[in-house]
């Protein structure tokens, strides 16, 4: 039972990471602003995502803190679609579950231990360190739709090939990693940051809807209503209200909501700051998992 709760918690980490997976001013503006994904060709940008959540599985509480740090450079722009070269710079997770403290960090120790918590932490730290500082490519249109992600699958394959583990264990790890870390995984993770734009001029009070779906073991549909709350110089503050739902054939069910504020630089579409609260319930394999989380996203131009 202890093992199943631990596995479910780690699996939930990757699922919730996806949902994760969102200066100066010249005074309040009464006029509208064009709002679209408009990162500049030849420029670089950094994103930092922090997710702090509490889960409850069969009356067992789990505390998880997730950190992701990314850098991107816009290498091409055909007027409609931007090509972006991206790298994970650091990945970390601290988890307290069933009385065990599990720490995973791409910059931390990857030493293995007989202790189950340290062994898992060391193994996943190896996974994280094998992914960072390796570029992959993303194509994004002006509404923030992620059209294509390429190169991440090769990063995962290379990382697994470099690990000194038995062939049977490698095959199992490969099957798991292909589901948790893949081109589609990256696409799902960044959809919430990029897929927010109406691609038109907006004024305070305007509303629009955006939706996207995630794949994998815990696929879900995300439907968000965005409201323009304030325009201050070039910066637009949005209120986001998201409904989360799914019903898979295997019986997995996800329901939830997420609310928050997003500050966007209208000149580029860079998400300068975003803070949100999430409440979600996942039912899988007869177990019910309640999730209450807070997330922060910060973007900066290099």
Q: What annotation goes with each model-predicted range?
A:
Residues 1-10:
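Bacterial N-terminal signal peptides that target proteins for export
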Residues 11-13, 17:
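Residues within alpha-helical transmembrane segments of multi-pass membrane proteins, especially transporters
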Residues 19-22:
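C-terminal motif of bacterial Sec signal peptides marking the signal peptidase cleavage site
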Residues 26-302:
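Signature of exported/secreted
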């Amino acid at each position: 039972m202890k093992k199943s709760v631990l596995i479910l918690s780690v699996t939930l980490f990757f699922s919730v990471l996806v949902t994760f997976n969102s200066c100066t001013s010249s005074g309040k503006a009464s006029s509208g602003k064009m709002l679209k994904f408009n990162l500049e060709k030849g420029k670089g940008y950094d994103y930092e995502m922090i997710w702090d959540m509490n889960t409850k599985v069969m009356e067992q509480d789990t505390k998880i803190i997730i950190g992701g740090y990314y850098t991107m450079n816009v290498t091409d722009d055909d007027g409609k679609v931007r090509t972006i070269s991206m790298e994970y710079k650091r990945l970390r997770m601290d988890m307290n579950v069933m009385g065990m403290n599990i720490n995973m960090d791409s910059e931390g120790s990857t030493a293995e231990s007989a202790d189950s918590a340290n062994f898992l932490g060391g193994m996943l730290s190896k996974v994280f360190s094998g992914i960072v500082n390796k570029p992959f490519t993303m194509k994004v249109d002006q509404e923030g739709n992620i059209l294509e992600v390429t190169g991440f699958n090769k990063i995962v394959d290379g990382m697994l090939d470099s690990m000194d583990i038995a062939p049977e264990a490698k095959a199992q790890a490969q099957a798991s990693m292909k589901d948790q870390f893949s081109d589609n995984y990256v696409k799902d993770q960044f959809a919430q940051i990029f897929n927010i734009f109406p691609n038109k001029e907006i004024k305070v009070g305007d509303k629009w809807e955006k939706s996207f779906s995630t794949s994998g073991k815990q696929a879900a549909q995300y439907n968000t209503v965005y409201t323009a709350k304030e325009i201050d110089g070039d910066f637009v503050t949005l209120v986001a209200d998201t409904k989360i739902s799914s019903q898979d054939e295997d019986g997995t069910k996800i329901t939830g909501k997420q609310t928050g504020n997003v500050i966007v630089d209208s000149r580029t579409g860079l998400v300068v700051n975003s803070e949100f609260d999430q409440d979600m319930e996942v039912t899988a394999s007869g177990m019910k998992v309640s999730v209450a989380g807070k997330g922060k996203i910060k973007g900066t131009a290099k």
